[in-house]
Amino acid sequence: MDLDTITSISTPMGEGAIGIVRLSGVDAVDIADKLYKGKERLEDVTSHTINYGHIIDPESNEVVEEVMVSVLRAPKTFTREDIVEINCHGGILTINRILELTMTYGARMADPGEYTKRAFLNGRIDLSQAEAVMDFIRSKTDRASKVAMNQIEGRLSDMIKRQRQSILEILAQVEVNIDYPEYDDVEDATTEVLLGKSNEIKTEINKLLDTGTQGKIMREGLSTVIVGKPNVGKSSMLNNLIQDNKAIVTEVPGTTRDTLEEYVNVRGVPLRLVDTAGIRDTEDIVERIGVERSRKALGEADLILFVLNYNERLTDEDRKLYEVIKNEDAIVIVNKMDLDKHLDLDEVKDMIGDMPLIQTSMLKQEGIDQLEIQIRDLFFGGDVQNQDMTYVSNSRHISLLKQARNTIQDAIDAAESGVPMDMVQIDLTRTWEILGEIIGESASDELIDQLFSQFCLGK
């Protein structure tokens, strides 16, 4: 594939130890050579070497910067094109000047994600691997980065390719049946093979979909809402979990008048913590807005932490809150265990039934470990770090897998009902195409452009 040569700054803008300008394309080395002065021309250096020299403005012959230049020849590069990386001192002025020179002498400013897009278009990675690159960049826990790295290395892709190959084998058998309809034994054998392999494919798709919830948590974070009536210790809990003081903690009920969000790594599980305003009837218009936002956050939550006060009796307000959350994934936290007891724990247990209950003192930082373990076990059922690393974490992949499961089931139902094989073939072919969309074998140009537009510039 013959593409023009692109350039961009690949390091964050601002002062820093180094800055990198990256070029990729057929003219990458030639353009860099026009700006570089060193011991030998970049055109003549060995691939995958770093070369010391200077960037010169050819028009004025002025030395712009002292640099180290990496030359990487196709096809053994990320994009499978020639790549040049100019390493200079960090700083906005110099790196921008080098970037401008590369564009003056023939390169085009890269679009967001264009390097990764070229890696996909040139066959180095498939679409699911390309999407995993962004997941890796955005990872908020070690676990999430390992899951993304497994996908970059092709673990999910290999699974999808195996299922597509199995479908092709079924389709080949179906073709024999269509070509020789007069042989009953061929039809019987075809139906037997089709049902056996199709059910195996459906089982494998279901296994992948079973990881979807956990995978999305790894990718996007577990949306966790802390809820309770005012002044039960919700903000103190947030602060203990994030070990920060973003949420204001006072003795005045209703201090948190908005939803506050923080990401935190809880035993390998990324939590997107949302501390809400206390949900209660209020005449304060500002607090009322916060209460409405709290209700909205509750409706979107993956997990709810329902906080009660050990120092107060159970109230109608507590019961109303429980009614709102009783059908959700929730953990009940009895806080302020360091104070005098006024809460009847048996009454609480009767109300919440099988819902997990943890006793804490946020002031003395007691019970935090038990809470973290309960959160982990509720969604991952044990040690997150020691579980298998293959998850489906992307909403697009999950949607396509569900479609593929439906169409393979249609093929199974049709075969069992004695529908003609050429009709069954349609469902099988559609399943093969849907699975291909996951890895980009049958994705539209519009979808590809949309996915890569979400990447950062320089990646």
Curated annotation (Swiss-Prot):
Segments crossing the lipid bilayer: none
Gene Ontology terms: cellular component: cytosol
Lineage top rank: taxon: Bacteria
Keyword Metal-binding among UniProt keywords: yes
The keyword Ion transport appears for this protein: no
Major location category of this protein: cytoplasm
Positions annotated to bind K(+): 231, 250, 252, 255
Species name: Staphylococcus saprophyticus subsp. saprophyticus (strain ATCC 15305 / DSM 20229 / NCIMB 8711 / NCTC 7292 / S-41)
Residue sites binding (6S)-5-formyl-5,6,7,8-tetrahydrofolate per the record: 22, 85, 124, 459
Gene: mnmE
PROSITE patterns with a match to the protein in the record: G_TRME (PS51709)
Entry protein name: tRNA modification GTPase MnmE
Record lineage: Bacteria, Bacillati, Bacillota, Bacilli, Bacillales
Cofactor: record remark: Binds 1 potassium ion per subunit.
Subcellular location: Cytoplasm
Keywords of this entry: Cytoplasm, GTP-binding, Hydrolase, Magnesium, Metal-binding, Nucleotide-binding, Potassium, tRNA processing
Domain TrmE-type G, residue spans: 221-380
